[in-house]
């Protein structure tokens, strides 16, 4: 009789083990607990399932934000300082990281400019003593100073 009433514990244990393997990155998939009753074990299983699914959604949201962050860094590496991270992670630390990185990009854009490739091209022209061209839509400090320098020379 006791084993009959405690048998749902095995299903709960299996479900929790699957969940812990998932959140510890041992597996990419997670299963929910099969709920066979509406007693205390069934209610506990349902509550655990809700949290498993919520955690899975949150981790997927965080993964998407990390992917977009990596893509944003690639865009910035190519010279475009207007790129920003727009995906919203769920993890508070990732939200803070996103905000700090976007603030850093705001500062770089304000102090340098929007297009590092255009700035580099103008500097190459200046090295060849060609001061005719200007940076279009200059707004960053380096861009504005570069245009002013070209005007003076």
At which residue positions do the language-model features occur?
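Polar/charged heptad-repeat coiled-coil helices used as signal-transmission/dimerization stalks
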Residues: 3-152
């Amino acid at each position: 009789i006791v084993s009959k009433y405690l048998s749902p514990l095995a299903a709960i244990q299996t479900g929790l083990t699957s969940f812990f393997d998932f959140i510890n990155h041992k597996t990419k998939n997670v299963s929910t607990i099969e709920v066979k009753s509406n007693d205390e074990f069934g209610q506990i299983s349902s509550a655990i399932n809700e949290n498993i699914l919520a955690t899975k959604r949150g981790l997927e949201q965080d993964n998407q934000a990390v992917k977009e962050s990596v893509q944003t860094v690639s865009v910035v590496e190519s010279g475009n300082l207007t790129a920003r991270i727009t995906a919203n992670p769920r993890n508070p630390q990732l939200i803070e990281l996103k905000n700090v990185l976007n603030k850093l990009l705001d500062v770089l854009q304000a102090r340098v400019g929007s297009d590092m490739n255009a700035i580099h091209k103008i500097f190459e022209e200046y090295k060849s003593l060609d001061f005719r061209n200007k940076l279009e839509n200059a707004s960053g400090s380096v861009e504005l100073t570069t245009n002013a320098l070209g005007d003076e020379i």
